[in-house]
């Protein structure tokens, strides 16, 4: 089914890298309004807060994506004290970080009118956080079951409720 989604909005987790940019574009090409959120902490993207308007304009001009910057430093620092799923390479709390960021994005959904969430995750691309079992844990522990669409690998995953409801075509 091709979705007629002029009224549908997706909230995408956006790193600014290729995968999240492609995920946003794939969804937008279906006529779905995409709002992207780039979470920042002192460990990633913090310098962007000094030139927030410039960054937002640049992403809109180069990728056609509307992006919001959101500083989650206090909550992220709390997560670092004891990540439930441990640390990955280079002291990264990969799985816990994804759970946290998706949980934060889910809280933002009403604010932007989003019906579902989007990420640029690809099965097997990252050894700790993008294994099939890890993707399920992340979705479950972030309470994003059914609303988390991973368009770059959707055909390799079970359909989400958003897909079953016809909000997005896999």
Label each PLM-derived region with a short phrase.
Residues 1-170:
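ATP-dependent adenylation/nucleotidyltransferase module used to activate substrates
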């Amino acid at each position: 089914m091709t979705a007629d989604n002029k009224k549908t909005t997706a909230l995408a987790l956006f790193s600014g890298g290729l995968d999240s940019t492609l995920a946003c574009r794939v969804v937008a090409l279906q006529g779905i309004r995409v709002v992207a959120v780039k979470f920042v902490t002192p460990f990633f993207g913090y310098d962007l807060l000094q030139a927030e308007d410039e960054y937002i304009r640049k992403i809109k001009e180069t990728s056609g994506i509307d992006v919001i910057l959101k500083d989650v430093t206090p909550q992220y620092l709390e997560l670092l004290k004891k990540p439930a799923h441990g640390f990955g390479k280079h002291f990264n709390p990969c799985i816990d970080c994804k759970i946290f960021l998706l949980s934060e994005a889910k809280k933002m959904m009403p604010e932007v009118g989003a019906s579902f969430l989007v990420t640029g995750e690809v099965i097997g691309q990252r050894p700790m956080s993008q294994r099939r079992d890890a993707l399920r844990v992340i979705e479950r522990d972030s309470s994003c079951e059914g609303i988390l669409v991973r368009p770059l690998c959707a055909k390799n995953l079970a359909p989400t409720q958003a897909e079953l409801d016809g909000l997005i075509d896999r």
